[in-house]
Amino acid sequence: MRPDALLTLPDYLPDHPDILFVGINPGSYSAQQGHYYARATNRFWWALNASGLVPVSLSPQEDWRLSQFALGLTDLVKRPTNSATHVRGDEFAAGRQMLAEKIARVQPLIVCFNGLTGYRQFFQERTQPGGQTRRVHGAWVFVLPSTSARNAAYSRDVILGYFRDLCALRDVLRHHRKCTEG
């Protein structure tokens, strides 16, 4: 087995995060770098910073800091690959169970899938980006277009619009939680 075959990214799972971001699986480059969405062409960090979801500008090397802002990071499948198309069906099946357990344990307000594929593999159904009507363990579900540069179907500005919608949903749910908890 290659030494890098064992590398993956750690989960960042604070208790009761506002948003739990769920990737499909770590890219090989990100796993080698040790940080989520580490490739400079990935639009995750740019959109996160521009959307208002965090009060400071963060880089991939500061992924661990998301917990400070009530945000979490994980993946549906933890094995890194060069492309999500290399993830096997049995890995997705095992990942569904593990992700459901993580969601039940940390109880996020919102589970946010980075990409339609992650949502489709978890729920076994198709959807469009944006807020969803279904819930998982009480959490609202939101789907972002994949922030990967390979996703040419969505421009940077469209992706930013979805991040801003996510920010607005988070703010509404935070307010509602504050009002109902006293």
Model regions: which residues?
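Short, solvent-exposed loop/turn segments at secondary-structure junctions
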Residues: 25-29, 78-81, 116-119, 147-150
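Short, hydrophobic/glycine-enriched beta-strand segments
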Residues: 18-24
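Short amphipathic alpha-helices and their capping/turn segments at secondary-structure boundaries
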Residues: 8-14, 57-66, 102
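Short glycine-/acidic-enriched loop or helix-start segments at secondary-structure transitions
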Residues: 30-33, 120-124, 153-154
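Internal catalytic-core helix/loop-beta-alpha segment
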Residues: 68-122
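C-terminal capping/extension of enzyme domains
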Residues: 1-18, 40, 83-99, 125-182
